[in-house]
Amino acid sequence: APDDDDKIVGGYECPKHAAPWTVSLNVGYHFCGGSLIAPGWVVSAAHCYQRRIQVRLGEHDISANEGDETYIDSSMVIRHPNYSGYDLDNDIMLIKLSKPAALNRNVDLISLPTGCAYAGEMCLISGWGNTMDGAVSGDQLQCLDAPVLSDAECKGAYPGMITNNMMCVGYMEGGKDSCQGDSGGPVVCNGMLQGIVSWGYGCAERDHPGVYTRVCHYVSWIHETIASV
């Protein structure tokens, strides 16, 4: 099975609260990222599913109490009904918060996309995953600027494994990527949430860019799900 892709390599420490939509999913420890898309709702990857999750908002250094954090428990965790643990198709889930988050400069929403990302568009990926393959996670939020790759490049890197609901973001030459620990976290292009960190082979390896859930295919599912609960 593909590795869950969960740490940023070759990026930089985000300026504090530069990506205030980025949240940490916690079950006694940080295990995945997510994105705040409404005061009461977070989107993440379905492979990050846990029945109960504490969502930590306004975080920068997840090992320290910096005074800006808000912790809110989940009241519902909803995986996409067509999620496949086999090929990670439809790797998206929604987390309903037990109370809406208060928005401020540390905690803010990211817009859902109005269209799909295009090849070559530059995006910001943020997360707390490991900074070296197999190493411990970085405690400060890491950022990476990376381009959306073409479908041809993506399918060429992972023959037979890329569905229409996936896209590759990153560098074919390797050295910069998201990895274990960033899973579920955001890919933001032009102010819109276009990707969710999903999977990849290894981390920052040549010819194996990160694979991301294509959020633009799920906007109606997100709206319908939020409206129905």
From Swiss-Prot:
One of the GO BP terms on file: proteolysis
Record keywords: Calcium, Digestion, Disulfide bond, Hydrolase, Metal-binding, Protease, Secreted, Serine protease, Zymogen
Broadest EC class assigned to this enzyme: hydrolase
Catalytic activity entry: Preferential cleavage: Arg-|-Xaa, Lys-|-Xaa
InterPro entries named among the record's database cross-references: Peptidase_S1_PA, Peptidase_S1_PA_chymotrypsin, Peptidase_S1A, Serine_Proteases_S1, Trypsin_dom, TRYPSIN_HIS, TRYPSIN_SER
Protein name per its UniProtKB record: Trypsin
Annotated S-S bridges: C14-C143, C32-C48, C116-C216, C123-C189, C154-C168, C179-C203
TM ranges: none
Keyword Calcium annotated: yes
Cell compartment(s), UniProt: Secreted, Extracellular space
Active site feature: H47, D91, S183
Proregion span(s): 1-7
PROSITE patterns per UniProt: TRYPSIN_DOM, TRYPSIN_HIS, TRYPSIN_SER
Cofactor note: Binds 1 Ca(2+) ion per subunit.
GO molecular function, one term: serine-type endopeptidase activity
Entry similarity comment: Belongs to the peptidase S1 family.
GO cellular component terms, semicolon-separated: extracellular space
Binding site for Ca(2+): E59, E69
Cofactor names: Ca(2+)
E.C. designation(s): 3.4.21.4
Primary location class: secreted
Domain Peptidase S1 per the UniProt entry, residue ranges: 8-227
Site features described as Required for specificity, chain residue numbers: D177
